[in-house]
Amino acid sequence: MAVKRYNVRMAGLGGQGVVTASHILSNGVVISGGHSSLVPFFGSEKRNAPVESYVRISADEIYEIGEIIYPNIIMIFHPSVITLGKSYTMPFYTGLKEGGVCVINTGKPIPFTKDEQKGLEVNNTKVYNVP
């Protein structure tokens, strides 16, 4: 059975465009005939503070709002979300569904801790580093 719904969690730092990217993704889904909802989450700080945004994508109507606890896809906009723990959700892969995807904005692979590596392997997570 094909997946009819995707939950995307985006994490980065203030000023990187995490919220803008979630709006673009959500609007693209709606324009193409799908259903989408998004919820940005950030503090009162301006730049370099943790930012998360949650996008739900579905072929059917969406009634849920709020934080996505169990995403299919995690997008990391800055390596420090992982290396310095600059995220509201730690460790960064928390809740990722089995067979999930993690896209990291970096030109070279990030050295994960043993616990992070084990957590990703247990879930059969595909990690992509995209510069």
Would you name each region that the model predicts?
Residues 1-131:
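Active-site cofactor/cluster-binding pocket
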